[in-house]
Amino acid sequence: MLHETISLALLGQPLVPGLMVVSAILYLLYSTQQWRPKNLPLLNDAGPFDFLQATAVKRFRRDARQLIKSGFDSYNNVFAMRTDVGVELFASPEYADQFRNHPSLKVFPFTAKMHHGHLPGFELCRSQPVEDRILIESVRTQLAQSLGKMIQPLASDIGQAISDRWPSESGWQEIALGSVIERTIAQGTSSVYCLDEAWPEFVVKMEMALGMASAALSAWPVMLRRVVAKFLPECLELYRIMDAGRELMSRDMRRRVALQASTGEAPLNFFEWFKEASHGEEYDELILNLRIAFASMHGLCDHLVKILLRLSEDPQLVDDLRKEVIQVYKTHGWSKTALYHLKLMDSTFKEVQRVDPILFAVGRLAVADVALKDGLIIPKGQSIRISGHTMWDEDKYPDAAHFDAYRFYKLRQAPGQENTAQFTSPTSDHLGFGYGGRACPGRFFAAAVLKISLCHVLMKYDIKPANGETGPHVWEFAAAINANMTANVLVRRREPEIRL
């Protein structure tokens, strides 16, 4: 087990003072060797008395959006900035087309760098070439080809999850929206990840533990993180949960094998799709399944909470969406065609993603030296982020600061924009799902789950802010815009016009 490799004798010692002394020594050596851009301005640099760059890191975590804006206001297209992973490059959206399919600018290595994927216990964020290829192929090919057959089962599973997790009493009931959504999505999508009854609670704990461990470790200097990770309480908790996850997934795999042997049917789940996509190459199927489950859960829950917080304050939009659901379902039932025709709902999702994207700077890591057309050289191992600030640009989106759920619904009616205005269509002006060949490969599955979930909620519940007060929908941390998962709302069971 991971946690058993840690020397327990060290845990009771006064580690922090000792580590700080070591930090001071290493800082003097390390700070002179860090990569610094030769021909680019460096923002948010550590001052001479900024011990271990702590102030610079704190400033980036607190004010990243304003720092990035000031960088582009002052330096136009490209600049460097000190962040919580060292010095990174930031490029304007004009670079998006050069980045979109560049073979040496990778997503998974970037994620691994951001979230310590090279360290034991953080395997959920690691990048390994064979696993990365299998993950992408299984989503783009096997999952995509199976999606049509999955709509009805997903609708049934999500409907059951809502029945199990949401209030059944009449009258208004206050709920912790984030917690309810996490468990609803975990249970409703469990068939493609894990059938064990412990899965929903496990995956919620896993997501929380990884987020807390990653944030806690990021507060330490890069050169100390491998050592510090062995002692931080948040990391120790992550190790414990990862051990439990391996046991749970192993138990589920045995159950699936037995089930398939008895029925003779090939199940629709990632374990089977990984086998097909591996083409005989070796991989860690337990870690790969947890990797994709974590990525899916995080994005789905974040987006659905943002949507529902918006809807809790907009009864007219709720009414319009309900009318659309009734009309579409009566005609198409549960099908891919039905989800396509939920055009106002699709527009609402895309507008929420425009206003509050989960990341407002899309990252890549150079796995080889990269030379761009204007002469910019990105050295191997260097991360670079493309800013998504065009999503808030008045020239691109009139009245951009205003949330308009009908914005993309109207754009889809304009000649030539039927496809680009769809939720799952990334463009250089809307980087919510990334861009190019490395845009989020699971976005079609995500859109299906989100639409099915919202259909059920709209038909079965009224929703409004708790205590009549509208709180913040999101909170920002570094370059992320996270849903306010602690928000409470009031929900009331209603008699649906149609039975889904």
Curated annotation (Swiss-Prot):
User: How is this protein situated with respect to the membrane?
Assistant: Single-pass membrane protein
Q: Which GO terms describe its cellular component?
A: membrane
- Cofactor(s) essential for the protein: heme
Q: Name one GO molecular function term.
A: iron ion binding
Give its localization: Membrane
Annotated heme binding lies at: 440
What EC number(s) does its UniProt record assign?
1.-.-.-
The record's listing under PROSITE patterns reads: CYTOCHROME_P450
**An individual GO BP term:** mycotoxin biosynthetic process
Q: In which pathway does it act?
A: Secondary metabolite biosynthesis; terpenoid biosynthesis
User: Which stretches are transmembrane?
Assistant: 8-28
Job description of the protein:
Cytochrome P450 monooxygenase; part of the gene cluster B that mediates the biosynthesis of the fungal meroterpenoid acetoxydehydroaustin. The first step of the pathway is the synthesis of 3,5-dimethylorsellinic acid by the polyketide synthase ausA. 3,5-dimethylorsellinic acid is then prenylated by the polyprenyl transferase ausN. Further epoxidation by the FAD-dependent monooxygenase ausM and cyclization by the probable terpene cyclase ausL lead to the formation of protoaustinoid A.
Task: Report further notes.
Answer: In A.calidoustus, the austinoid gene cluster lies on a contiguous DNA region, while clusters from E.nidulans and P.brasilianum are split in their respective genomes. Genetic rearrangements provoked variability among the clusters and E.nidulans produces the least number of austionoid derivatives with the end products austinol and dehydroaustinol, while P.brasilianum can produce until acetoxydehydroaustin, and A.calidoustus produces the highest number of identified derivatives.
Family assignment from sequence similarity:
Belongs to the cytochrome P450 family.
**Name the record gives this protein:** Cytochrome P450 monooxygenase ausI
This chain is encoded by the gene named ausI
